[in-house]
């Protein structure tokens, strides 16, 4: 069910229990706090904050490992004095940085359960999430405390820093964790507490965190992790990417910064609006890298797009800092090869990786840019017209399962449902199932969703669709919810989208269905980036000039109206998609910008586009 007509098979594979066991890596439980405890007397840098009010080029706060350990213990003692006990849920509404890192590890020290529902969910989504999680405490900045009072968010309210007595009374605040900043702006320390607290030993299978999905495929879901599963995530990342004490991590995706202390890595979050990843600039990223002599960078695809777009602002020192980076990780949405190529020029000595995973388990697979190139070459006819691997195509290559993980396919059936049995047969499209020590414990208070996700014992149903190639690499073809049941058969969206995106006139594309399931028409909605004069340039050119324009992704562009695409553009896209995938498009529509999720700014809201496309084609 790649994005062309498919002969679908159910396939025969190993049993769920047998295959899941293959990926498991038994290991002794190492608590998330282990590295912090071991480095309690280490005077080297643990956490760095960049100035959030400036241009992202200056450091505002630095904590050594010894200082971080002291602050975590002091903050845990203060939270205990304010009533936090083992098992209590604590909602942390604090911007990424040293403060949030300290609070997270303080909660772990107490055996409390952190609730992380980011503001990227929007106010309605955030309210729904928090009322579902029902935390006992809410630790936040004034804006969060004010929202909590107005929107009746649950939990005893605790301020990060002291508020005036009037404001404390107005917001119903029980106290603060940290003292006020000093006159010179130096951040305050945890409020001194005379009580001596005996911290509990970590319980491996006790709840540790409730994290929330992005809400890009429906209401955000709370995902519960135990101490053991968080440690498994840390171990998967450490073993896959070679993290070691002394590694420097620039986290353009905030959750990864929080893993820094557990990995034994020095971490920094670059200056950016965390709810809008595409606000990350090359200068801010490079300055953050320079601040910790970074070896690893993690950023979302949308963030990297803007980093590449603003690269001309870099000075020699910033370019030198990026040249020291050894690994770049990016996940959350497919990353086009041209973006990876442009990024390579900024980090010339780095290996680029695009891991696949989800809130329920990250990472699941990993692939390097070199492996992507190799896979594409194997799926492309050579000079003799031979194809080494006919299944190395029609999707996004995300590589092989990471340390401790296993992947299998539940074949897609003609009605869009999936088969019960699993397979590893190359070329069979179906739902992607994963098994790993770091996959979630359960969905929070979503019992039906949880039962569906674990309906195959030992496996998590991801809701993504894809296939394996002859080498065992995984190729993602889209979301199960976005599979199209058309008159041409069952189609998955990614291959047709990739085909259209290979044209210089198309920045981004989304395949949607218009009409009843089973007889729906495939419609491609393209984003005409700074929209497409490349087409008009091609029409007016000839010979060598026309051939050159065909090769230039940035050929002159200017806006065109949203709605049905101009005839010439439509024909160009239809022909390309038909040649590459066999899919006959019913229509090509144009939008200035696709609707995307807030967290990554990358995941396209295809249901919304489908509704819009139906109205446009109906003349509404």
Feature roles, as predicted:
Residues 1-4, 8, 82, 110-181, ...:
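Structural core segment of the AMP-binding/adenylate-forming
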Residues 43-45, 180-212, 219, 243-247:
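Conserved pre-ATP/AMP-binding loop-to-beta segment of ANL
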Residues 46-83, 88, 94-97, 101, ...:
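Conserved AMP-binding/adenylate-forming core of the ANL superfamily
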Residues 62-66, 200-202, 208-235, 266:
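Conserved AMP-binding A3 loop
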Residues 112-113, 231-248, 254-296, 310:
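Conserved AMP-binding/adenylation subdomain of ANL enzymes
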Residues 138, 297, 436, 441-442, ...:
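AMP-binding/adenylate-forming catalytic core of the ANL superfamily
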Residues 326, 341-355, 359-466, 470-471, ...:
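Conserved AMP-binding/adenylate-forming
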Residues 484, 510-512, 562-563, 570-620:
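Conserved C-terminal "lid"/linker of ANL adenylate-forming enzymes
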